């Protein structure tokens, strides 16, 4: 689960991280009052959407010469003017896609005198199984660009879970960021704060870009992006309260009601699979044969007919879907349950696109019988390779 920048900063501040004072607003009328609460004379007006690249982004409704989603204001009048321009409009960044995201809230923040911009993030290093700091002296820009153009400027420091952040590992972070004096002293403490927050709140990613050194030598969290492990949210009702469903894909929200692992993608072949590994392999082989998956969807091992029906309806609700591949290897999951769910869903919503079904495993004969006797126009496949080729060919033929 993702949260907004102002929420992420509030979480980090509760652990002792240095952040600027700020106020979240939802209407232009609140902008002047927010500015009054902050000392000035510089304010920063920030669009709050679940996407990066806001500063370089552009609003659809404004001219090409209009400012982006993060703006400096040198008077309270400027704060109000920017708020009126930004709220309710659609911000397009490199992470939102061309459709952009509507800005429903802003964060008015006290400005800072920036001497140096750095990059600092925490995530789980899948190679070592440890939480790691990923840091760079190249802050304030897209870390993807740094990784592509100058990867040597990114350093990873793994943290031993049995010790947490020691003075030695905190010093390694400071060395990688080339910090000295007051900034180094601040970062020694901040590294421990960030690690504690990451672990205690079950975060999956914590990104600070930029982490700044101010003119007075102190460090400050200037921007913060936090994602939480969805499987651990039951332990954090305070974090659950921060969820903003207006920032989420409607299909993903619907999928969460049925405990379906669903992620919307940009392709045109819908996928319904059991098991995350098989789902990823299915997506890979679709790409191998020249097409793009429209989603990741794992129905899990204990799916019911109702759950499968819901999954199928979610896939067909995507207007970009031009074909559907159902790929089931039944171990815990029974093929007849999948078949019943598919048949029920198709009869409910109608089937306007090609459908390829590959079933193997528990009750496979019964599952195939259910589909064959349904009277539906379903293309049967014997294995994953055969299924991928058939759905790609069927979509090309239909379009």
Swiss-Prot record:
Family label: Belongs to the succinate/malate CoA ligase beta subunit family.
Residues that, per the record, bind Mg(2+): 209, 223
Keyword Nucleotide-binding on entry: yes
Gene name of this polypeptide: sucC
A Gene Ontology term for the protein's cellular component: cytosol
Subunit annotation: Heterotetramer of two alpha and two beta subunits.
Positions of ATP binding: 46, 53-55, 109, 112, 117
Enzyme class of the recorded protein, top EC level: ligase
The ATP-grasp domain, residue ranges: 9-254
Binding site for substrate: 274, 331-333
Catalysed reaction equations from the record: succinate + ATP + CoA = succinyl-CoA + ADP + phosphate; GTP + succinate + CoA = succinyl-CoA + GDP + phosphate
The entry's keywords: ATP-binding, Ligase, Magnesium, Metal-binding, Nucleotide-binding, Tricarboxylic acid cycle
Residue stretches spanning the membrane: none
The EC number(s) this enzyme carries: 6.2.1.5
Textual note on the cofactor: Binds 1 Mg(2+) ion per subunit.
Cited function: Succinyl-CoA synthetase functions in the citric acid cycle (TCA), coupling the hydrolysis of succinyl-CoA to the synthesis of either ATP or GTP and thus represents the only step of substrate-level phosphorylation in the TCA. The beta subunit provides nucleotide specificity of the enzyme and binds the substrate succinate, while the binding sites for coenzyme A and phosphate are found in the alpha subunit.
Protein's name in the database: Succinate--CoA ligase [ADP-forming] subunit beta
HAMAP family: Succ_CoA_beta (MF_00558)
An example Gene Ontology biological process: tricarboxylic acid cycle
Taxonomic source organism: Maricaulis maris (strain MCS10)
Required co-factors: Mg(2+)
Listed pathway(s): Carbohydrate metabolism; tricarboxylic acid cycle; succinate from succinyl-CoA (ligase route): step 1/1
Pfam name, any one: ATP-grasp_2
Molecular function terms, GO-annotated: ATP binding; magnesium ion binding; succinate-CoA ligase (ADP-forming) activity; succinate-CoA ligase (GDP-forming) activity
């Amino acid at each position: 689960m993702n949260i907004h920048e102002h929420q992420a900063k509030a979480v980090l501040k509760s652990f002792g991280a240095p952040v600027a004072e700020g106020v979240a607003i939802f209407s232009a009328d609140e902008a002047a009052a927010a500015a009054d609460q902050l000392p000035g004379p510089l304010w920063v007006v920030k669009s709050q959407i679940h996407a990066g690249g806001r500063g370089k982004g552009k609003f659809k409704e404004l001219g090409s010469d209009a400012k982006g989603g993060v703006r400096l204001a040198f008077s309270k009048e400027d704060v109000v003017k920017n708020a009126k321009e930004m709220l309710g409009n659609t911000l397009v960044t490199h992470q939102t896609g061309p459709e952009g995201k509507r800005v429903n809230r802003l964060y008015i923040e006290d400005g800072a005198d920036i001497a140096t911009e750095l990059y600092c993030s925490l995530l789980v290093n899948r190679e070592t199984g440890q939480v790691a700091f990923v840091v760079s002296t190249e802050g304030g820009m897209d870390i993807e660009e740094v990784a592509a153009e100058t990867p040597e400027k990114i350093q990873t420091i793994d943290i031993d879970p049995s010790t947490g952040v020691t003075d030695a590992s905190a010093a390694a972070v400071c060395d990688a960021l080339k910090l000295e004096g007051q900034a180094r002293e601040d970062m020694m403490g901040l590294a421990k704060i960030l690690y504690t927050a990451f672990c205690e709140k079950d975060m999956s990613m914590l990104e600070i870009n930029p982490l700044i050194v101010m003119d007075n030598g102190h460090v400050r969290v200037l921007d913060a992006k936090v994602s939480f492990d969805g499987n651990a949210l039951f332990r954090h009702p305070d974090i659950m309260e921060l969820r903003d469903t207006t920032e989420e894909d409607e299909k993903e929200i619907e999928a969460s009601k049925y405990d379906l692992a669903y992620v919307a993608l940009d392709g045109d072949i819908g996928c319904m699979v059991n098991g995350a590994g098989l789902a990823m392999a299915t997506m890979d082989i679709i790409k191998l044969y020249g097409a793009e998956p429209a989603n990741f969807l794992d129905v899990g091992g204990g799916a019911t007919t109702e759950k499968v029906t819901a999954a199928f309806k979610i896939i067909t609700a995507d207007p970009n879907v031009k074909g559907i591949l159902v790929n089931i290897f039944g171990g815990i999951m029974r093929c007849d349950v999948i078949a019943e769910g598919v048949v029920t869903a198709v009869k409910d919503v109608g089937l306007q696109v090609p459908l390829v079904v590959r079933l193997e495993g528990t009750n496979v004969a019964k599952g195939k019988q259910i589909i064959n006797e349904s009277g539906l126009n379903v293309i049967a496949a014997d294995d994953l390779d055969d299924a991928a080729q058939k759905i790609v060919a069927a979509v090309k033929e239909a379009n």
